[in-house]
């Protein structure tokens, strides 16, 4: 089986958005080797069995060179798809910036899928293993009303500064 490396070591949302890329490559016969932030590795491995994940330090400034090195040390020279736009050391950051940093005509997820040569409609082919026992435990812990809204205000640049208002229970 041919190996291929995928460079997108983090943020969690980017990893989830790119999982269908790895699935597509796996279905095409590749053994996908994907360095990701060490603090995400166990969680992602519990849910995804079609990728070989490698831990790299969750330091945005060093992680891309470390990811390349981790692949090379383990497998030597194999093809690598770098889709880690905006991470220092990524080979695609310059093109990404020229195209509008994900806010131009081509959105950030479209950019990643194009570079990986994966049809964009594969984005919706997210496949993972579920743990219903843990899901129900979390549901029971947080959901206190029949109607609820789940919001995420934290992002890579900090925290969104606005008040969320709803007639429903708000789960942050």
Put a short name on every predicted segment:
Residues 1-172:
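Catalytic machinery of carbohydrate-active enzymes
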